[in-house]
Amino acid sequence: MGTYLSSPKTEKLSEDGENDKLRFGLSSMQGWRATMEDAHAAILDLDDKTSFFGVYDGHGGKVVAKFCAKYLHQQVISNEAYKTGDVETSLRRAFFRMDDMMQGQRGWRELAVLGDKMNKFSGMIEGFIWSPRSGDTNNQPDSWPLEDGPHSDFTGPTSGCTACVALIKDKKLFVANAGDSRCVISRKSQAYNLSKDHKPDLEVEKERILKAGGFIHAGRINGSLNLTRAIGDMEFKQNKFLPSEKQMVTADPDINTIDLCDDDDFLVVACDGIWDCMSSQELVDFIHEQLKSETKLSTVCEKVVDRCLAPDTATGEGCDNMTIILVQFKKPNPSETEPEDSKPEPSEDEPSSSS
């Protein structure tokens, strides 16, 4: 259940933004938890045709979530597959790349900085002074040079995070997910789940865990982790005879691609602190109701978070960190709309309706 405070921290980190195609609002709150382990990324213009939104829910610490919020979108856009138009492959590679980048001296140093264990100016870490050699650092997002140092054999963090990201490019939406954060789209006020929660009771997940040498006890891998896909959690990825996608816990994302249409109202990406309190349809209904009187999307997100916050910690529900990103699609002006017979039809592979 985690450690709870005597009273919740209700201060919120909220943000709004827009471009010519969409606008977004977000809000994040620590709540009853002793620490804040969520992180997020909201990049309106990843390039001139692309927006990116990601929620990263940390467990066992905050550093992996913060690492992903800083680097995952950079790895998507810098990948050769992205440059050739293969967004799905680029997303998948970026998820796996996070695990690779967090290993070795460079990975250890980055995590130490994000975890506030390193003095960013002196390089002093818990009493040990070390600084990277001149020329070891590189500001290019697609470059990750190896560094020599006392932690060159670091195999990666034992903590981890979920990753649920939505990439909007032209009229296509790509959703990549590992873990139990969730992406939902409202289409004509109906909620459609664009991701699925990765839990040990799913047959495909259970089969992979057992084949990798793990077991499931009380709904947790090896009696410990209640997620089957995550970035980080390297202790569950040490079977040297298996590729990354077949480890007990894998960063391999499910990827869902849909065509956006004029029936789409908005998109939500949120951590399980929200979904544990509201179903997908309940949240969509709540947001529609709020939008009748509120135009600032971050305020709508704040109302969602307040709605989910528990009055006490008796049940544990409503006591988690909470992060929600709300993305609203701008409708074209009547003068800009296409002739009736050329309007895009909803995708035949319409998202599965939420239960």
From Swiss-Prot:
What Enzyme Commission number(s) does the record list for this chain? 3.1.3.16
Report the cofactor remark: Binds 2 magnesium or manganese ions per subunit.
Q: Does the keyword Transcription apply?
A: no
Give the UniProt keywords, A-Z. Answer: Hydrolase, Magnesium, Manganese, Metal-binding, Protein phosphatase
Residues binding Mn(2+) 2, per UniProt: 57, 272, 320
Molecular-function annotations in GO? metal ion binding; protein serine/threonine phosphatase activity
Q: What is the name of the protein in this document?
A: Probable protein phosphatase 2C 21
Question: Could you tell me which species this protein originates from?
Answer: Arabidopsis thaliana (Mouse-ear cress)
